[in-house]
Amino acid sequence: ACVGDGQRCASWSGPYCCDGYYCSCRSMPYCRCRNNS
């Protein structure tokens, strides 16, 4: 399963973002999925 917009993600181990999203780690300490459009 993948996670969507605003959900917590981890680029190195998952959970991974759904298609159309990328894992943004700017808002530490957690990474969150952002729309990549």
Curated annotation (Swiss-Prot):
Any GO CC annotation of this UniProt entry: extracellular region
Impact reported for S37A: No change in binding affinity and in lethal dose
Site features described as Pharmacophore, chain residue numbers: R8, W12, Y22, S24, R26, M28, Y30, R32, R34
Residue(s) carrying Serine amide: S37
A biological process from GO: envenomation resulting in negative regulation of voltage-gated sodium channel activity in another organism
Protein name: Delta-amaurobitoxin-Pl1b
Impact noted for substituting W12A: More than 160-fold decrease in binding affinity and no change in lethal dose
Residues the UniProt record annotates as site (May be involved in voltage sensor trapping upon activation of sodium channel): D19
Outcome (variant: S13A): No change in binding affinity and in lethal dose
Subcellular location(s) of the protein: Secreted
Keywords: Amidation, Disulfide bond, Ion channel impairing toxin, Knottin, Neurotoxin, Secreted, Toxin, Voltage-gated sodium channel impairing toxin
Family as reported in the entry's similarity comment: Belongs to the neurotoxin 07 (Beta/delta-agtx) family. 02 (aga-3) subfamily.
Molecular function GO terms recorded: sodium channel inhibitor activity; toxin activity
Tissue distribution of the protein: Expressed by the venom gland.
Outcome reported for the amino acid change (mutating Y30F): 16-fold decrease in binding affinity and no change in lethal dose
InterPro entries membership: Beta/delta-agatoxin_fam
Disulfide-bond pairs as recorded: C2-C18, C9-C23, C17-C33, C25-C31
Domain notes: The presence of a 'disulfide through disulfide knot' structurally defines this protein as a knottin.
Function of the molecule: Insecticidal toxin. Binds to site 4 of insect voltage-gated sodium channel (Nav) and inhibits channel inactivation. In vivo, it lethal to lepidopteran larvae. Has no adverse affects when intracerebroventricularly injected in mice at a dose of 0.2 ug, but causes reversible paralysis of legs when injected intracerebroventricularly in mice at a dose of 2.0 ug.
